[in-house]
Amino acid sequence: HFLPDAKRAISLIIRDNNSYLESDFAFAHKAHVQTYMMQSGAYDIIRELERYGYDSITNCNWGNTPKEYHFPDAKIAEIIRPRDDSSKYIVHTVITNANLPITGLKLAKKIQTPSRKPEELLKIIKSRLLEFECNIIGVAPAKRLKDIADQIRNHYENETEFIVKDKAKRFYDFDPEITRKQRKIYSAEDHLPNARSVIVIGLKIPSETINITSKTPAEAIGPYAFVQYEIQVRLFILAWCVKQILEDHGFKSAISYDVNGVGSYVGNPRGEQPDIFSNAIAAVAAGLGRLGKCGFAINPIFKANLRFIAVITDSPLPTNKVLTSDDMHLLCEECSHDRVECPTNAFNDEINFSIDGVVSQFRKIEVNRCNWAKRYSLSAEEGNKYMGWELDLPVPENITENKLAEGVKKHPTISKYRPCNFERCFLKCPYSG
């Protein structure tokens, strides 16, 4: 049905273990990027086959192809998965007329890489990440993240976050479904039992993308919205590489977009993306920066222009020291941009915590006030006015489910599915751009 003279099927396989704390976003985003990686690998195979004069095709289960003609990738995944393995197996197939040797459906037993000293393993990880143009890498002991969680937990766990989903189809009026999420603060062990180390990976947002956002003459916001999405794709690919290296050496691992859980999300045309506060504390714990007053990490070289992902592992890797004021002096004490620029007045009192004797301070954010703007597009100043929306609702003193529902019902019917938002506190920060 796919290639008239087909002779062989080449199946690419991903084996995946779910994290103990996988959010809806993490689950969906992981599946999306894994598909992206499989497709990229499939196209590389096709290009090589075509170099030698063979025809090939992939993506046989996409588009309007009737299901009875789908290639049985899911069936192959069932066959190759060992009975005693609870992991998820994902298969993506290339069909070709090249008469390649047949390997069969039984996977060869994975050869365990000899154990290495922690210093050698970290060197391998860093070398691999640098091949993918990773900007910055740090490691924190899992205990640091637990100590921080214990210090800040009381400031968050009495707070309820409202989660809004649109039940309506595209191009229909917004039909809100609101659920309550009790905020929780996590440690590395919540993501992976017996966690020993947390590897934090950072990628830089291009400075000019930040500098042009919402500024005249173009008042462009699209480039920043694209970076919000694309940087998360690249971060996951980097984290996946680290995960494979660790597991090749016999260690367990889990990927997290926000280890401690202090962050939230920002509205984006390609689905909500982790905001600038996600994994900021993990980055500080890994020695990659100091925590600014607004609650995001500031690095001596890349300033606040970084986004982070974390890999939690039971490998006892060498760790970074925490940066002090001697390493980097922040201007936050003299700055009032956080409260002046926030359109929803989301910043509250300061929270302090100590890591290895180094004190960090930041203002706690009232999550529903912050989400009113950057996540749910109800404040013009955090993005929607630059997309032509005429929606700017003053934030209520007390945000309730009903008030939030009434607000999102005012989303424009046609363009509601393409929100382009940003964190105004970040764009106005002297350390951005």
Language model region names:
Residues H1-K30, T113-G222, V227:
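Non-catalytic, usually N-terminal nucleic-acid engagement modules in DNA/RNA processing proteins
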Residues A26-S115, I210, K215-Y431:
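Catalytic cores of enzyme domains
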